[in-house]
Amino acid sequence: MVYDIAGLRVFIDNKYPYTTKFCTKYLSEDQDAGVDIHATVTEEEFAEEKACSLNFSDGYIENICLYRSICAQMPLFNRILLHAAIIEYDGKAYAFLGRSGTGKSTHTRLWMKHIDGVKFINGDKPILEYKDNQFIAYGTPWMGKEGLGEKTQAPLCGLCFLEQAPENSIKRMTAAETSARLFTQILLPKEEENVVSTLDFLDKMILELPSYLLKCTISEEAVQKSFEALTGKQYISKNI
């Protein structure tokens, strides 16, 4: 079946029904026109993933492999996978990044709790495109275990790296600091051409997007600090 994902036509060659149901909202109305990406899974890829995922169904394992295939081809179209939670506010997207367990979903949910007009684009594995001198964040079916996201897109206007801390503080990061953290949040393809394209994409992100380090607790004060730094606006809680 053909799906519309991140502005591209993607043919997904799946064996199990899991992915068909998983991607239903992204099914293309046009199943006949040409495609940009053909995603498939070899027996070797499936077996390798299954060896690492013994407690999951074959359909789930195939689904993981298929998205890896899709994302490995994205650099051909000036796009990459970013491991982040991305939300939209006032027509602009903001990405929250960090190691597993640092609270990306928790912090972005606090944005939704305390700020009017916030919505999730993707809670875990969005696709980014660089187009017309700006970055576009796309929702995808792969949204993480919480299932937070929509089939939508918005210009990405800032990055916020999270660290747990006993007190809340935020600072603007240097290019070197951003590079060290950002590199761990992407999928680096195996093909040399795609590796080069991905690294060029990351260079643009580092140079063109403001990046912040938020050391935070689970609190409204943490939301205020990240909101004001990323948006440049005064924080007003919707609960007042």
What residue spans do the PLM features occupy?
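Conserved lysine of the Walker
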Residues: 104
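Hydrophobic positions on the alpha1 helix immediately C-terminal to the Walker A/P-loop
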Residues: 107
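A noncatalytic interaction/capping subdomain that flanks phosphate/NTP-handling catalytic cores
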Residues: 1-100, 110-121, 127-240
